[in-house]
Amino acid sequence: MTEPLTPRDRLIVALDMASRDEAERLIDRIGDAAAFYKIGYRLGYAGGLALAERLAASGVKVFLDLKLHDIGNTVEEGVQSLARLGAHLLTVHAYPQTMRAARRGRDSVPGSALRLLAVTVLTSYDDADLREAGYAGGVADLVASRAAAARDIGIDGIVCAATEAAAVRAVIGPDRLIVTPGIRPAGAASGDQKRVVTPAAAIRAGADHLVVGRPITEAADPRAAARSIVSEIAEA
């Protein structure tokens, strides 16, 4: 049986910086206020994968937000390589062929604890963006259909905006993860996110993990900012 998540376990700090050195300095400043970090494209291509391996070896959880999407064989082999780094979470786009390939890749690595997350609709998108991209329906419909596909294929969890978390939970059930980006403490600027929610509201909506970037990484005191968000999670 999985142990209950502590408030600190629920916070994932987004390391959206340009170099490994910069990321490591931030991790040092945050200290024990967080123990879960997200590495995406920018840092991933600038020493982030080596950093992910080091952090995982030291017991820190790592979320590789690489949003893989390619032909099946390429995704399968890429996930095999990433699973060996020791990361805890990895994102793939919620297309059936991509998700099945990711599962094959992960399952082929003995002892891998990697959990796969399907990206439904990016939190920078709204209904107008989907119409521009050629989709007939809106965000809510596309999120629900992609979440159902991920559930049926056996993906471990879903990445979605907290505004969709309750609806996604109804689709995927209680045992799969929901990870929500676009989290901003009360009063913080929304930046380039269009569907933002406070930490407490996201937890109440059913999210398991919250991804927070600039409110922590650009704070004068990142450790205090992380602790404040953990406190808000605890009070939800």
From Swiss-Prot:
CDD domains: OMP_decarboxylase_like (cd04725). SMART domains: OMPdecase (SM00934). Its EC number is 4.1.1.23. Keywords: Decarboxylase, Lyase, Pyrimidine biosynthesis. It comes from the Bacteria. Coiled coil: none annotated. PROSITE patterns: OMPDECASE. The active site is at residue 67. Pathway: Pyrimidine metabolism; UMP biosynthesis via de novo pathway; UMP from orotate: step 2/2. It catalyses: orotidine 5'-phosphate + H(+) = UMP + CO2. Substrate binds at residues 16, 38, 65-74, 123, 184, 193, 213-214. GO terms for cellular component: cytosol. GO terms for biological process: 'de novo' pyrimidine nucleobase biosynthetic process; 'de novo' UMP biosynthetic process. GO terms for molecular function: orotidine-5'-phosphate decarboxylase activity. The keyword Lyase applies. Pfam families: OMPdecase (PF00215). Catalyzes the decarboxylation of orotidine 5'-monophosphate (OMP) to uridine 5'-monophosphate (UMP). Belongs to the OMP decarboxylase family. Type 1 subfamily. Homodimer. This is Orotidine 5'-phosphate decarboxylase. It comes from Methylobacterium sp. (strain 4-46). The lineage of its organism: Bacteria, Pseudomonadati, Pseudomonadota, Alphaproteobacteria, Hyphomicrobiales. The gene is pyrF.
